[in-house]
Regions:
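Beta-loop-alpha module in the N-terminal Rossmann-like domain of NAD(P)-dependent dehydrogenases
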Residues: 1-50
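Alpha-helical elements of Rossmann-like donor-binding domains used by nucleotide-donor carbohydrate transfer enzymes
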Residues: 7, 19, 46, 72-75, ...
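Glycine- and other small-residue-rich loops at beta-strand/loop junctions that grip anionic moieties
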Residues: 10, 36, 62, 117-118
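A short helix->loop->beta-strand "cap" motif at the edges of active sites that frequently abuts
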Residues: 27-29, 54-57, 166-168
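Hydrophobic residues in well-ordered beta-strands that form the structural core
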Residues: 33, 58-60, 171
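Rossmann-fold dehydrogenase core element
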Residues: 46-63, 83-90
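Predominantly a Rossmann-like dinucleotide-binding segment in NAD(P)-dependent oxidoreductases
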Residues: 64-151
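Active-site beta-strand termini and strand-to-loop segments that position acidic
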Residues: 155, 160-166
Length: 172
């Protein structure tokens, strides 16, 4: 209460992101958040309302947008030099073992993590698809728990077909 930093960088377990961000925004302190911004749609709406009322700025860390190769691809797409984008494929091949979830005290739970591979491991790849291709117009997805059924309650596998205004992408 006595200090007023220029910015707060929130890099805590997911379930703490929104309460900490709202606390800071209500005090007009700029907020920079790690992913995910929220663990539910309702939380995201609360965060948006707090940001709209605040004089402070709210930002999210999607750092892969600034990789040189991604910037070059974005420039080629936006300039038309790459031609028309017809489709895309994105694969997240990493796999987390049981210890990643069980030793954290909060991962693997809908209440505290908010989801699994969708909002944790693959979120940066999803962001790059949107950054390069625009906002999705339709999404057809299946999520399941193939590998850690008796360990976590969130999904560990996601398959999606995403349409970006006529550009079709497969995501796994």
């Amino acid at each position: 209460e006595q200090e007023k930093p220029d910015v707060v960088h929130i890099c805590t377990p997911h379930y703490l992101h929104v309460p900490m961000a709202i606390y800071s925004l209500e005090r007009n302190i700029n907020v920079f958040m790690e992913k995910p911004p929220a663990i539910s749609f309702d939380q995201l709406e609360e965060l948006k309302k707090a940001a709209a009322k605040s004089e402070a700025q709210l930002g999210f860390c999607y750092q892969n947008r600034y990789n040189a190769s991604i910037r070059a691809a974005k420039d080629l797409i936006d300039s038309g030099k790459a031609g028309k984008v017809l489709g895309a494929r994105a694969f997240v091949t990493g796999c987390r073992g049981a210890a990643y979830y069980t030793e954290s005290g909060w991962r693997g739970s809908l209440k505290t993590e908010g989801g699994g591979v969708l909002i944790n491991q693959s979120v940066h790849t999803q962001d790059l698809l949107c950054f390069l291709l625009g906002d999705p117009t339709t999404v057809d997805a299946t999520m399941t728990n193939h590998h850690l059924k008796n360990v976590i309650e969130v999904e560990d596998t996601l398959e999606a077909y995403i349409d970006f205004n006529g550009v079709h992408a497969s995501f796994y």
